[in-house]
Amino acid sequence: AYTYAILTIPSADRESVYYLYGGSAVNFSLPELFGGGALGLILGVLAALILAGCVAAVIAWLIGLPVLRLKSDYLAIATLGFAEIIRAIFQWDRLGPVTNGANALKSFPTFSSFNIENANGEVVLRLSTFVPFLLVAVCIGIMVLLINSTYGRAFKAIREDEVAAEAMGINLAKHKRMAFCISSFFAGVGGGLFAMFANQAQA
């Protein structure tokens, strides 16, 4: 959610959003970089959602190095612990010019930004209803393709029996880390979609 918001807040609104920190350290907006307008909005939002997923995947890879050595409840506890650490880091005042500290990030494109209005400002086509379903359908399609791939079959083998999967030559550590990163990627995209729904992002 933070990655999406930081990358899509319009340049003209950054000073008002980051007023406690004298402005934002990030002085660009992806929709503006893509030329603005309807096409710039679509491309900018898609790029921001993908980057949000990538940032989440990179963080998951770093966390997975020590955490994936654990199993069962200990893995869940360690993951929750790292989540709280990351939340505290995002609220750190030193990072305020980037994350806005403990304050909410606002003014970024939301689902209502995709509605088509006439000259009087009245909504003539409410695309905000269909955009989230379209994005979720794309994510589900990618997941289905992944599940039916070679990697997906390896994931299912590990789920059923780790010992048997390792005996078949499947690298458990590599595939567990990959599954952790892939799930975090979609969680990052989901965070961006939640920010668009909630109209703000706050740790």
Task: Annotate the PLM regions.
Residues A1-A203:
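Transmembrane alpha-helices and adjacent helix-loop boundaries
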